[in-house]
C-alpha cells in the first residue's frame, strides 16, 4: 500500500505499508523535511537508513552509493540524494551491529540488548517462514509492484540497459519503454539472476532517478520478505516524492 497526503503547511507526505498475512508490518513515512522514517511491527519510528544498515549496507558511504542516481557536480563529485543525506543526519548508528541493536531496543524496550540477540530477533522477524508469511497473493503483489517490468514501463531511460557479462547494449539511453522494449529486456535475461534489478530514468522535469527493483523472479511460494524487497520498497517511495 502506498499513500500521499498534504499537511497543514502544504507539504506532500508519503507513506508505504507492507502488511503480511502473518508477521511484522513494515511502514515507511516521510515528513515535511523529506526525512524517511520506518516503523517496524507498529513500534516507534526510526530513520529508514537504520533498516538499510541492518540489511548489510553498514556505512554511510555504502548507503549513499546505493541510492545514488549516478549524477556528478562540475568537479566530478557525486551528487547524493538529499533525502537520504537528511535521513542519515538523523541516524545515530554507525554499523550494521549498532543498527540491529537500535531496532531491538525499539521492539524490546527494557530488555538488555546484545548483538547476537538483536540479529536473531531481526532474522526471525522477517526471514523465518514460521513467523512471517506474505501468502502467495502477497508475494505476487510485491513482485508486480516492485519488479522491473512494472517500474520500467512508460519510463524514459537515462542510461542504457547493458548486459554486464557481454557488454551488449540491450536498450539505448533515451528510449521510452513500452511493452515491446520490456519483452526485449526479458528475452535478454539481464534481470533474470538473483538480487536487484537497477536502472536509471529521466522524468518529465529532466531529473535522473535510480530505480531499484526487487528480485521478481522469486516463486509465489517464497513467502518471506527479502532484503531486496525492503530496499526496492524504499526506492519506490523515493520515486513517488
Feature annotation, model-predicted:
Residues 1-241:
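N-terminal non-catalytic structural scaffold regions of very large proteins
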Amino acid at each position: 500500500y502506498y499513500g500521499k497526503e498534504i499537511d497543514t503547511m502544504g507539504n506532500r507526505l508519503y507513506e508505504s505499508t507492507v502488511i503480511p498475512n502473518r508477521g511484522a508490518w513494515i511502514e515507511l513515512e516521510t515528513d515535511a523535511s523529506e526525512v524517511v522514517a520506518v516503523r517496524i511491527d507498529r513500534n516507534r519510528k526510526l530513520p529508514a537508513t537504520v533498516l538499510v544498515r541492518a540489511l548489510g549496507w553498514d556505512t554511510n558511504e555504502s548507503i549513499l552509493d546505493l541510492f545514488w542516481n549516478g549524477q556528478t557536480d562540475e568537479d566530478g563529485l557525486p551528487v547524493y540524494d538529499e533525502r537520504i543525506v537528511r535521513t542519515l543526519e538523523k541516524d545515530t548508528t554507525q554499523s550494521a551491529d549498532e543498527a540491529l541493536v537500535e531496532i531491538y531496543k525499539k521492539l524490546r524496550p527494557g530488555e538488555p540488548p546484545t548483538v547476537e540477540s538483536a540479529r536473531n530477533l531481526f532474522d526471525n522477524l522477517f526471514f523465518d517462514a514460521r513467523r512471517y508469511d506474505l501468502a502467495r497473493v502477497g508475494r505476487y503483489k510485491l513482485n508486480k509492484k516492485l519488479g522491473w517490468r512494472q517500474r520500467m514501463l512508460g519510463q524514459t531511460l537515462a542510461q542504457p540497459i547493458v548486459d554486464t557479462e557481454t557488454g551488449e547494449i540491450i536498450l539505448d539511453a533515451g528510449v521510452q519503454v513500452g511493452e515491446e522494449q520490456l519483452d526485449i529486456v526479458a528475452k535478454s535475461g539481464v534481470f533474470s539472476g538473483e538480487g536487484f534489478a537497477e536502472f536509471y530514468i529521466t522524468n518529465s522535469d529532466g531529473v535522473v532517478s535510480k530505480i531499484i527493483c526487487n528480485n521478481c523472479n522469486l516463486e509465489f511460494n517464497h513467502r518471506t520478505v527479502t532484503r531486496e524487497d525492503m530496499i526496492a520498497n524504499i526506492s519506490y517511495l523515493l520515486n513517488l516524492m
